[in-house]
């Protein structure tokens, strides 16, 4: 059995670690809310672009939403474990943090490796959407119109991409290519936007996905602090229990 003075020295250490870990867990919980919000924002703001990408790329917002939800639940569990000062719960918390960190690390690596595939996928699907375009609009035609209206662009590389489509042969350029609301006759190249959409879309996606990647990387690194704190508090509690015995 340890001396009373030894136990008195251990208790302030435990109290200190508990306070710091509670603050950390609250901030960690907030990052989960941020990731959840970023995932929802990405799903809404990039929906038109994602509709012209392959299924892997469209899963990105859902991955962020799922990760944010897991972090919120994990943060709640971590707060409970810290308040209870339970050594085994804190070890479990550290293990979950490690697992989530590894998943985020793998996801970041996969996203970096396949970033060129996303570009090629968008370009191929956009070209396909132009060839199959109809003004009454399936979801891809609607996405093309939305992108061209919003970004004031026309075609993939430039407006001439439309000249190879069936729609152009029948009706000319779509209204979404027009500089003004009405550009009749719709075969007049001077009345449509000349710039293509591909470069503009890629600039937006890279910019917004860069924000997402930066936030995700920051959250992942922040988890390392939590792993360290949870492990240290667990050790301190375990040592204190041995000292009492």
From Swiss-Prot:
Predominant location category: membrane
Topology in membrane: Multi-pass membrane protein
CDD domains xref list: TM4SF2_6_like_LEL
Subcellular localization: Membrane
UniProt entry tagged with the keyword Transmembrane: yes
Spans through the membrane: 20-40, 60-80, 94-114, 209-229
Alphabetical UniProt keywords: Glycoprotein, Membrane, Transmembrane, Transmembrane helix
Residue intervals on the Extracellular side: 41-59, 115-208
PROSITE patterns registered for this protein in UniProt: TM4_1
Family matches, as InterPro entries: Tetraspanin/Peripherin, Tetraspanin_animals, Tetraspanin_CS, Tetraspanin_EC2_sf, TSN6/7_LEL
Residue ranges annotated as Cytoplasmic topological domain: 1-19, 81-93, 230-245
Residues bearing carbohydrate: 134
Family: Belongs to the tetraspanin (TM4SF) family.
Protein name per its UniProtKB record: Tetraspanin-6
Origin species: Homo sapiens
Lineage: Eukaryota, Metazoa, Chordata, Craniata, Vertebrata
